[in-house]
Amino acid sequence: MQTVLKDAEDRMKKALAALDKEFSRLRTGRATTSLLDGVRVDYYGTATQLDQLASVATPDSRTITIQPWDRKAFADIEKAILKSGLGLTPVNDGKIIRISIPPLTEDRRKDLVKVAKKYVEEAKVAMRNVRRDANELLKKKKNDKAISEDDQRKGQDDVQKLTDNYIVKTDEAFSKKEKEIMEI
């Protein structure tokens, strides 16, 4: 029974980690290097992650700088950022690419909160699926006479407590992200 709980907890942790990763990609008006995590650059015919072609830094809260290691990559990096759909405009001065992060409009902030809410719902669904799988496994063990009915009921209660705990953590992460997005 403990293995079922441990497995369920590991899977819920992964769902929460995936939510945090999605949240880190949401633009909040502050410059972070994680904004560019999903950007792939077509470099000599291969889709390459930006951080493998250049050093990415945030000198202040409104600017991201990209310093490519290969001068030939400047145009490819600019093109990839423009195509990424992030709404960012790179400025190339020949040595470094600068991206200024404009302040978000009220409408854009509300849209980002909706996107964050969608990510939260996806994480909650994933956690509920983990709960369902764990409960089915406990039921199967009871039917196979590996555990008693009392143990099954206790296991299901423990899985429910675990699920409730992780859903609270998910809601807390959303509240924090919502506050960050709506902050001017």
UniProtKB/Swiss-Prot annotation:
User: What highest taxon heads this organism's lineage?
Assistant: Bacteria
Sum up the protein's function in the record's words. Answer: Responsible for the release of ribosomes from messenger RNA at the termination of protein biosynthesis. May increase the efficiency of translation by recycling ribosomes from one round of translation to another.
> Listed GO cellular component terms?
cytosol
Give the record's family classification. Answer: Belongs to the RRF family.
**By its UniProt entry, which Gene3D superfamilies does this protein fall under?**
3.30.1360.40, Ribosome-recycling factor
State the CDD domains in the record.
RRF
Q: Where is this region: Disordered?
A: 141-161
Question: Which Pfam family is one of those matched by this entry?
Answer: RRF
The primary gene name is: frr
Mention one GO biological process in which this protein takes part, according to its record.
Answer: cytoplasmic translational termination
Gene Ontology MF term list: ribosomal large subunit binding
Q: Where in the cell is it found?
A: Cytoplasm
Q: Which UniProt keywords apply?
A: Cytoplasm, Protein biosynthesis
Instruction: Give the matching InterPro entries.
Output: Ribosome_recyc_fac, Ribosome_recyc_fac_dom, RRF_sf
Under which name does UniProt file this protein?
Ribosome-recycling factor
Organism in which the protein naturally occurs: Solidesulfovibrio magneticus (strain ATCC 700980 / DSM 13731 / RS-1) (Desulfovibrio magneticus)
